[in-house]
Regions:
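A short SAM/SAH-binding and catalytic strip from SAM-dependent methyltransferases
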Residues: 123-139
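N-terminal, positively charged/glycine-rich alpha-helical extensions of SAM-dependent methyltransferases
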Residues: 1-31
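Conserved class I S-adenosyl-L-methionine
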Residues: 154-197
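A short acidic, Gly/Pro-enriched loop at the edge of an enzyme's catalytic core
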Residues: 114-125
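Short alpha-helix
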Residues: 209-233
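Conserved alpha-helix/loop element of class I SAM-dependent methyltransferases that forms part
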Residues: 26-55
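Class I SAM-dependent methyltransferase SAM/SAH-binding core
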Residues: 56-113
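A short glycine-rich, Lys/Arg-flanked "PGG" loop and its adjoining helix->strand segment in the class I
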Residues: 139-154
Length: 276
């Protein structure tokens, strides 16, 4: 059972971040491009998802909906987004109205997604970028994912690699081990958010969050225990945001380490299928 205090702190943080990200003063969220008709899904996501022509997609932890709406531009016929932040969902609905893209946005926690998103089941379930650190119960998470899928449907996971979650810059700006590979549900990592990954210098008022690290084995085994079949695992030396000062952003909007830095996986991708 999620500690209500942890959930409340995380929600307050993300409500505040949602307002900041929707304002998009730094351009990190590329809202102007979205409104101009762009597909904001990054190359890693596009390659993993493939053509979504005619398919229904549930996007979990959708935040302000920029990627959710981009799923239509990847070919999806029906899209539903879910996030626990009321402010994020309000902004997502506003973007849907402005773009004219008919996404359905629902507020709630991922564990309750099968009931919150209604009786219909989906061809695809998608989650990406900074999602799993907010989950304290992997089996409950994967059961929700499985319940959302139609028989034969697929789950697409794109997020920071478990190894990368362990890293932080040293005094020379190189990434070094700092955090545990895995944290128990009852002992999250308390994190005071003092820097915004969207490159804003604005100081948040609700800085305290609680996060969980999950090993690769724990993630994979939870998916298997939920009855899903792993079809593909991928590791990538690029990430949606910078986790160290020596990382630079390329024209594809992904951040990478310099050639002289030790090579480490930064993004993990998983494709899993529900039998049937």
């Amino acid at each position: 059972m999620t500690d209500p205090a942890h959930l409340a702190a995380n929600r307050a943080n993300w409500d505040e971040r949602a307002d900041l990200h929707f304002a998009d003063e730094t351009g990190f969220y590329r809202i102007a491009e979205l409104l101009a008709g762009a597909n904001l899904l990054l190359p890693i996501e596009r390659a993993e998802l493939g053509d979504l022509g005619g398919l229904s997609v549930a996007h979990l932890q959708c935040h302000i909906g920029t990627d959710t709406l981009s799923l239509f531009r990847q070919g999806a016929a029906e899209v539903a987004g879910l996030d626990f932040s009321a402010r994020a969902i309000a902004h997502a609905r506003r973007l849907a109205g402005t773009t004219g893209l008919p996404a359905r946005f629902v507020q709630g926690v991922v564990y309750d997604a099968p009931s919150l998103l209604g009786e219909a089941r989906f061809d695809r379930v998608f989650t990406s970028w900074g999602t799993l650190v907010w989950m304290d119960d992997l089996p409950r998470w994967t059961r929700a994912v499985s319940a959302l899928l139609k028989p034969g449907g697929r789950f697409h996971y794109v997020d920071c690699h478990p190894t990368a979650w362990m890293l932080a810059p040293d005094d020379h700006g190189n990434l070094a081990l700092r955090y545990d590979y895995e944290t128990p549900p009852e002992s999250p990592i308390p994190v005071e958010v003092t820097a915004n990954y969207n490159l804003s210098t604005r100081i948040l008022e609700n800085r305290q969050t609680f996060e969980w690290s999950h090993s690769l084995a724990a993630i994979v085994n939870a998916l298997l225990a939920a009855g899903l079949v792993i079809e593909h695992l991928g590791e990538h030396e690029a990430l949606q945001w910078a986790i160290g000062p020596r990382m630079t952003q390329d024209t594809d909007h992904l951040w990478r380490l310099p050639p002289d830095h030790v090579h480490v996986p930064l993004t993990l991708t998983i494709r899993a299928r529900k039998p049937g």
